[in-house]
Amino acid sequence: MTAMTTEILLTNDDGIDAVGLRALADALSRDYDVTVVAPESNQSGVGGARSWWDTTVEYTETGAGYAVDGTPADCVAVADVALGLDPDAVVSGCNHGPNIGAHILGQSGTVGAAMEASFLGTPAIAVSLYDRGNLPVPPTLDNGDFAVAGEVVVDLLGRAERAAADGDLALPFGADVLNVNVPAADDETAADPTYRLTEPARGFDVIEFRPGEEGPEDENVPEGWEFNERRGEMGMELRDRFWREFLRGDVPDDPGSDRLAVVEGEVSISPLSSSRSIAGDRAGEVVNGPAEAASGASRIEQD
């Protein structure tokens, strides 16, 4: 009896023509039955947004796969409902730049698609590329740059297959989603990369821009990441100072953070839960109400 081939749904947020998607499709197709359902245009930064109500999500079958006029999360829904696919796992990527830091996970379309899959009960891997010589995003990329990313995803899927229970793939570390950041193939660490279990870093802040106000020093900051280019505008932006610090050789970060793993040229693997809850075994307990709290006789106990 021939074993069933594991079915993979492949999507991304950079669009169906993105080189990272094509590179992963090539790598995964050697071992898996791969169906590509991806946005017809770049959807970077939309997070887990979905098209709702009176919005019609159009999709077209192309030589590269199904092109969806919608978000990455829409692509997962189209695959599930409109196309009737029942993949064993969803892979989202490979993104053309890293997706690291807790605040970025909420903004990333790559991670958003993976989360959408987990809401529908399918394990998912979000994978992104980083090039330490061209942060945050390399100016040009080709298939070869994603070679290590393909190898890492195939390895993680293989582990999930070996841990399968009742035919369902089981991601490592008990995760619903793995957020994975992988070095480019020409990185000196890429020949034998270290896998590092990480948590999304939490260091970021809000920058306020005021017309005519002097911005922070922008020495050694790549084009497009300066603060001074925003002079003359009024507004706010959630901006991660990490890249500026990294480019200056100053990286204050906690051991175990996804950002520090990137600095060290490692494969960062952050296990994520789709529930986003930390109640754990205490879920369902009764918490004393306001009357008890007002009397000073009550508080939410911690173990």
For each of these PLM feature ranges, what is it?
Residues 1-7, 30, 303:
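Terminal disorder- and signal-encoded targeting elements
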Residues 42, 71-72, 95-98, 185, ...:
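Short glycine-rich anion-binding loops that position phosphate/pyrophosphate groups of nucleotides
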Residues 18-86:
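A cross-family phosphate/adenosyl-ligand binding-site feature
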Residues 142-161:
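A structural-propensity feature for long, helix-poor, extended segments
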Residues 88-137, 145-146, 150:
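Internal, conserved structured core segments that host functional sites
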Residues 35-37, 66, 91, 123-127, ...:
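Hydrophobic/aromatic beta-strand patches that form the interior of the parallel beta-sheet core
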Residues 10-17, 104-106:
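Short, glycine-rich nucleotide/cofactor-binding loops
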Residues 166-303:
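C-terminal accessory domains and tails appended to enzymatic cores
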